[in-house]
Amino acid sequence: MDRRKRMQIIILLAMVVTMLVGCGKIDKTSETKENKEESLHTENVVPAYVNELIGIEKFDEKIDYSDSDNWMFLPEDISKPVDTIYLYPSAYGISGEVEDDIADIDDVNMRLMAIYYASSQASIFEESTNLYVPYYRQFTVNSLVDMIEESPESLQYIASRDIYSMLDYYFENCNDGRPFILAGHSQGSVWLTVVLEDYMEEHPEYYERMVAAYVIGYSVTDEYLERNPHLNFAKTSDDTGVIVSYNTEGPGNSEAYNCVVKEGAISINPLNWKLDDSYATNGVVDAKIDTKRGVVICTSMENTPEMKKALSEYFGEESLHLYDYSLYSKELQKNVADRINKYMKDNEE
């Protein structure tokens, strides 16, 4: 059975089991913030905010990324000259109630939802690259949003647990000097902003081989770029070593609270790859940058009443956050190939 057929079967099983699991509560013993035992870490080592998270002691155990069970995809057949590392969006606490703020690495529901997301998002990179998809311990949406807003300095500590360990393993054992792409969505893109700011600055020998970073579904801001002069935002369809980022909304979301849209956000139009407010369409969906809000406006689809209700608290009723990738999947797939071709041409020996 070839790899693509295996992937299709895994995805089908994931969707079926997710429906069977439904909204059942994960059966595990959990601490509360009031009676939680003190973390093995001290406040001198980690931000005080982190020690208030339910389940933070899980990070006292390091994930072994030499174990293939901690990867959704860990390719053995390296058939392409470029790799992609993809970090999936929020998958923990999506299909049912959970008690901890932080997932276990082998949380069944998280893994099933992660596979479901990867089937539509990570597959965009599979045609042009060797695809690496690690499992990592996620936060619930509400706990991550609270941490970003109340203690953004905690993000670096959290990323240094699983994400940095995974990157260390990948670069030391898997990469073999190949160019690479970083890709994520939503929570995955949150961690990519930390990786780009911190890990890549500490590892310029890796960063110089980065074709692009697709930080989609979370804001890259002017302030972020100003404090990180080693980073550059994409300006064209094929510049390399750059960040590609956007958030998609309907026109009625302009005044709504959206947890992934930050002040000073920048978006690139995924149809014409411009930063201005020029209108573009591929005949099916459209895109235009709201340069004031820093988002892509799409008028080609509308959320159902049920979806509007589900999105209203954290994203706004007309957020198209769930469709950031799927709306422009063909354009993204071509763009990946275009940037790779430009990188390879620029780096010919």
Regions found by a protein language model. Name each.
Residues 184-188, 192:
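Gly/Ala-rich beta-loop-alpha elbow adjacent to hydrolase catalytic centers
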Residues 19-22:
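C-terminal motif of bacterial Sec signal peptides marking the signal peptidase cleavage site
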Residues 2-10:
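Bacterial N-terminal signal peptides that target proteins for export
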